[in-house]
Amino acid sequence: MAKQFKRKSNGVSESNRKRGRQELRKVTRTAARKQQQDENHEDDLDVNNDSQEDNSEKEIDEEDEEGERDDNRGKAYSALLTLLKSEHKEKPKNVTSGSSSQVEKANASDSEDDGIAGANVEEEEEGEIDNNVDENEIVSESDVDDDDEDATNRLSTDPFESHFNLPSDDYLAKEEKLVLKDNEKWRTVDKQTYSDLAISSLVQLPPGEPLNPPLLKSSKLSEYTIKKRVLDSYEQAYGTDLSDLESTLINPILNYRDVNFQYKSFKNKFYRRLYTLHALNHIFKTRDRILKNTAKLHAAKEDSEELELRDQGFTRPKVLIMLPTRDACYEVVEQLIKLSGTEQQENKKKFNDQFYVKATPPATKPEDFRDAFKGNNSDFFCIGLKFTRKSLKLYSSFYSSDIILASPIGLSMILENPDKKKRQYDFLSSIEVLIVDKCNQIEMQNWDHVNTVMKYLNKVPKEFHDADFSRIRMWSINDQAKLLRQTLVFCEYLTPSINNLISSKSYNLSGKVKFKPIINSENSMMNSIGLKIKQIFQRFDSQSPLQDPDSRYKYFINAILPSLLKTSSYEDGIMIFIPSYFDYLRVKNYLKTSTKFTFGSIDEYSSQSKLTKTRQEFASGKIKLLLYTERLHYFRRYEISGVKTLIMYGLPSNPLFYKELIRFIGKSVFKEECDLDLALVKILFSKWDAVNLEKIVGNERAPVLCNSMNELYEFR
């Protein structure tokens, strides 16, 4: 296989190429591996530390990438480990006695088993795979597409084939100009309302011609082109029939369209088995095609024929799944194992030790909070998965992995390591399916890390890692991979940042499908509060989303604050809820320097002693006014006592918070500290808050509040 690689001309010396080929040949003979390689190797991408909530707030210093020519041959695992071993020590408080020694043994044994070291680790792994393939394996693995004579029909019926192998160079060049260079508007071609499912869908296609024709919707997975091993595992676990919602969602996913799906409640986890099925189907189809084409090339070589078969990217990883916590990662990996049909899993015990903890938050907390923070809630991890015909290897190196699961912060620490020599991003160059799950949790951690990852996705690699250019698809070489990458986004509720992933950062030529829950006045959050309390929605003018923070601030200090004591029936118990931390700092500074209010302020960075003291002083009336942030409420879910008047500087992104905040007043009413008829809730909003407004008042009322002549609306 090594002889098929084309020579590189990017400043790589002839001696280095020869050395790479020699090591490639050596690595396939296990007995020839040197003990020194065993000692130097670290094949563990995960980091043994339980970072606290504030770890997600670390900012990565961005530096200019132009002109950068450092030697980045070091493994991505080593880059992450070296950085974190010095800064983040493993905290034993979340592991049972004896677990630490078990993890250490797992680490030691992993290092001993995988003695691959040096700058050519990705070449060694790939060489190992290619040289171990025989024709019998190729035939047995190709359990669906075994008829080569039917290749033309397959291209038109199998979305995998038509999406990645059918597009011509001319078509992609034309679409690249329309979508990326001219930035022409996408067309909305279909809107559907599924009343029985309480959702609606919107389909957008790119300018020009879309890539894939739509698939016929089916209630049976067997009618789609899914690998037999995956299909059998799925049907054995979940049955042969799909529900209406499952069939509605799986159709665009299998058709390689971008999907934005709101699952509404953490209890709805059916979508996860659908995207893991799709990820495995994609991985196994990719592997089958490579194996088949390798056999064809061997046969053509024996017959002295020249054959061009392009079926690969620059690097092996094809699926990236971003998740907020190790517990979420553990659940997804378990789902992948369940559907993969693999007979054995390497490093499974080590994975369980580092990712699984049997722990749940107190029963007094809300259910969604307990789900978000259960188990190992560390937000610092990355792990590679490599599949073979019968086995799965956990903790595989990046460049030999098929699927990478990572938290955005864990991945961004590799992509923008302060030490330039340890930076790696080449392994993201050939990602074909991006999945971002539990987006709302990730957003509460730090969405900037997601933006960092998106910046490096499908970027042409700095080095080519002995890639065989005769096998690389032309759209990868021409830097057009982003036009074919599928992005799947799953969230409980939509926010502008999450919506932006599909709307502005995705260019999939197969199109985009956005699912949206139907929220009317009956099932809106406002209707579920259970308190007949006065709720006043006050609209202010804002010319653009960019000017919205300034317009909101000016309106608040000029119109709301001066009349606050006049409009409120109580002089104390005034809470101001502020979703944005930057707005919070701005208002806090104004109250401190320009008013005489006796106020307190608590946020996600406040010490525990300050949190306790400030809450007590507010409940007793010593502090008249309290500033309270959304992220603090997310991470602590306090029940604040003493609230009589509630001012929402902005709408909460999570509609559940709206109900919980208003129930602070309900608590005061129950304690007979205030009268329900005299209590007040005032909400500040602009027309740019339509997305958040819909979740609270419903799809019918939101357009009226945003666009009518009146600026003030009262509900009870």
UniProtKB/Swiss-Prot annotation:
Job description of the protein: DEAD-box RNA helicase-like protein required for pre-18S rRNA processing, specifically at sites A0, A1, and A2.
Which UniProt keywords are listed? Nucleus, Ribonucleoprotein, Ribosome biogenesis, rRNA processing
Q: Which organism is it from?
A: Candida albicans (strain WO-1)
Q: Which PANTHER family is this protein grouped with? A: ORF PROTEIN-RELATED, U3 SMALL NUCLEOLAR RNA-ASSOCIATED PROTEIN 25 HOMOLOG
Q: Which domain of life is it from?
A: Eukaryota
Where the protein is mainly located, per its record? Answer: nucleus
- According to UniProt, the name of this protein is U3 small nucleolar RNA-associated protein 25
- One GO molecular-function annotation for this sequence? rRNA binding
Please state which protein family the record places this protein in: Belongs to the UTP25 family.
Query: Does Nucleus count among this protein's keywords?
Result: yes
A biological process term (GO) from this entry: maturation of SSU-rRNA from tricistronic rRNA transcript (SSU-rRNA, 5.8S rRNA, LSU-rRNA)
Task: Give the CC-aspect GO terms.
Answer: nucleolus; small-subunit processome
Write out the biased-composition intervals (Acidic residues): 40-69, 110-150
In which compartments does the protein localize? Answer: Nucleus, Nucleolus
Task: Please list where the region (Disordered) is annotated.
Answer: 1-161
Subunit details? Component of the ribosomal small subunit (SSU) processome composed of at least 40 protein subunits and snoRNA U3.
> Which Pfam families does this UniProt record tie to the protein?
Utp25_C, UTP25_NTPase-like
Q: Sorted alphabetically, which InterPro entries does this protein's record hold? A: P-loop_NTPase, UTP25, UTP25_C, UTP25_NTPase-like
Where does this protein have compositionally biased stretches of type Polar residues?
94-104
Question: Gene name on record?
Answer: UTP25
Which spans does this entry mark as compositional bias, Basic and acidic residues? Answer: 15-26
